[in-house]
Amino acid sequence: MKRGRFILTTLSIFPLTIFANKFNLIGNTDKGFKIDSGTGRLHGHIKLKGVNSNILDVKVSGNDTGGGLAIFEQTSLSQGKGTPLHLHHSQDEIFYVLEGSYYFQVGEEKYKLTKGDSIFLPRKVPHAWTQESETGKMTVIVQPAGKLEDFFVTVAALNHEPTPAEMQTIFADNEMQVVGPPLKID
């Protein structure tokens, strides 16, 4: 991936936030909020099943922004596990590594990320990631918010570990498409 495109895309988000109120992208514009470290704004700790057993905290919900964006903090507890190769039809994602190390695939390119690194995953481009370190933590930004928050809540609510076929259906129900297996660490 070209660094210039990453920087340009990242910087293009900022004007959207400036004009979000004018274009009614923000749901609750008259009141700010603070989310304490180690907590989620909604849903408490979302404990995932299926893809990995990580914990997600919603920091900014799509409901807070009128669907404009969502921000999550992911505590990674699944060394050697990650997502299947998948794509989002309508959302771009940005990951920022707070702790630990991860491998990402974006299209055909593969990257190792460690603390302080970030990566941009454009919509409609297959991508996957796998946790290399024993534990880790990432901030995940999705723009627009789409249904990723619903995906996390759905997976956490299951009373069993989902089969690969169930996961494919859950991905599809939440505007994503599984296109390949999880990323193996080289």
Locate predicted features:
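N-terminal export signals
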Residues: K2-I26
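C-terminal segment of N-terminal export signals and the immediately downstream linker at the start
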Residues: A20-N54, A157
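A short glycine-rich, His/Asp/Glu-containing loop-to-beta-strand
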Residues: L48-L85
